[in-house]
Regions:
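Conserved NTP-binding catalytic cores of kinases and kinase-like/nucleotidyltransferase enzymes
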Residues: 4-10, 107-111, 190
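Short, conserved active-site entrance elements at the starts or edges of catalytic domains
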Residues: 68-87
Length: 190
C-alpha cells in the first residue's frame, strides 16, 4: 500500500505556494492539453497564498469567461478577502497538488502517483481533492494519514474549502454543473 501519510513528513516547507526544490517559474494544473498556469509565488500564511494565488486568479478567469456572473464572482471575492478566519496556522507541506483518483495508479504492490502539480500547500488539500471525485480506498488512505500525522481538529469541515480551486478550474475548463458546485461550496465559508 502507499505510504500516503509520511510523504510530506520532514519536508523543508519553505512557504505556501513554493515549488519543488530547484524548480523555476510557475507550475501547471489541469489536463495536459489545456494546462492552466499554477502560481508558485511563496506566502508565509496559507490564507494569503490561497486567496492571492488560487481563488482570486481562478475567480477572475471564470468571470472573464462568463462562467461566474457578477454576484457569484463577488461571493468568491468576499471569501478570498476573509479567508484568514479559516486558516489553521499549520506549516506548509509538500503536496501533489492535483491528487484526484485518475492520478493514483493502484496495483497489487501499492499506489503510484502521477501528473503532479507539486508545491508546498495545505496538507488537507490533497485529501480534499481525493474526496472530490471519489477515490477508491479513501477511508483507508485517510486512516493511514491520520496514523502518521493526525489532521487538525475540524479538518472535515474544511474539505469543501480546499475543493473550491479544483471545482472552479473544472467550471472554467469543462462547464457543466461545476460552477454551481463551486458557488455552493463557497457559500459555506463566505
Amino acid at each position: 500500500s502507499a505510504d500516503v501519510g509520511s510523504a510530506d513528513v520532514g519536508s523543508a516547507n519553505p512557504a505556501f505556494g513554493a515549488g519543488p526544490p530547484h524548480w523555476l517559474g510557475d507550475g501547471f494544473f489541469g489536463p495536459t492539453d489545456q494546462p492552466l498556469p499554477l502560481s508558485l509565488t511563496p506566502h508565509f500564511r496559507w490564507s494569503a497564498f490561497y486567496a492571492a494565488e488560487r481563488l482570486t486568479p481562478i475567480t477572475q478567469g471564470c468571470r472573464d469567461a462568463g462562467v461566474f456572473d457578477a454576484t457569484e464572482a463577488a461571493l468568491l471575492d468576499r471569501l478570498a478577502a476573509t479567508i484568514d478566519r479559516h486558516d489553521t496556522d499549520e506549516a506548509p507541506s509538500r503536496i501533489h497538488g492535483d491528487l484526484w483518483s485518475g492520478n493514483v495508479i493502484w496495483t497489487s504492490a501499492g499506489a503510484t502517483l502521477i501528473d503532479p502539480a507539486a508545491h508546498h500547500g495545505h496538507r488537507e488539500a490533497d485529501l480534499a481533492m481525493l474526496a472530490l471525485f471519489g477515490s477508491p480506498h479513501l477511508d483507508v488512505t485517510i486512516a493511514a494519514y491520520q496514523d502518521v500525522r493526525p489532521l487538525a481538529e475540524g479538518w472535515r469541515e474544511r474539505v469543501a474549502l480546499h475543493q473550491l480551486y479544483p471545482l472552479a478550474v473544472h467550471a472554467l475548463l469543462f462547464g457543466g454543473g461545476y460552477a454551481a458546485q463551486t458557488i455552493s461550496a463557497a457559500r459555506r465559508y463566505a
